[in-house]
Amino acid sequence: MLRALLVAAAIVAMTLFLIPLQWISILLRAPTRRLIPVGYHRALCALLGIRIRVMGQRTRLRPLLLVANHSSWLDVPIITAVAPVVFVAKQEVASWPLLGLLAKLQRSVFVDRARRHKTGEVNAEIAQRLNDGDPVVLFGEGTSSDGNRVLPFRTALIGAARDALAAATPGGGVMIQPLSITYVGLNGLPLGRQHRPLAAWYGDMDFVSHFRDLLRHGVLDVVVSWGEPIPYQAESDRKAVARSLESRVRGLTLAAQRGGRHGPGAGSASQPFLFMAKEAKRGRFVWPGLRRRGGRRTDPPCDAP
């Protein structure tokens, strides 16, 4: 209970400190508008005891659309901790207490599925993010699941993204990269099907209860897997693209689940990103762009712009 209170107090203090800084950065279009969310979510993951391993590489090609699976509110801080991104979210998120404000400060694009006549405005906003060089994250399932499986991808969401491409680039083309977030371990032990929903937040689950339970469980191991990017043109068949992305994300998720808490190929050609829980407790947490090894500054693992 004491740990939960201390963590909550630290998160509140950090949030109150960074909100005005991020707001000013957005108004001034300063580079820090991308870096502040990365640093904030890294610190948040560290405080929550989330340990992340990154498999594969995020492409540096732009414009870039990332299509991922979705099982928890934790997906957002985890993805942002490893890459400076913006999200496409449903309109209801904008009205959620605190989470809605944080989503706005991360320059999320909100989609109102009930107001089809607003589609043009939404597409223009997505196009603006792509033109600015921001990787845009789209949750292909359109909802969250229990984390044990990848739900069918909604072709309408892919179609909406395609419509935005025409405005984003003269040729209407973009790179689209599959992305998987898989919760694989708890306190160093493999997280099986029965316990994976401990990390998931879906249906009508209460946020406060889920947050409290998360603090009780200890260190949570997560694998973030980057798939091979594919070119996506305005004339592409959205159904075929959606099926391909769904298959790739499902394959990445299954590979991570079978690989246990270290994910597939641990110790081989992976890109480890494990400072979150343990290094933060040792006082070794570093802000994006300020990581030091042997007294020398090195680039952060999220290749911040």
Task: Report residues per predicted region.
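Aromatic (phenylalanine/tyrosine) cluster motif
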Residues: 273-275, 285
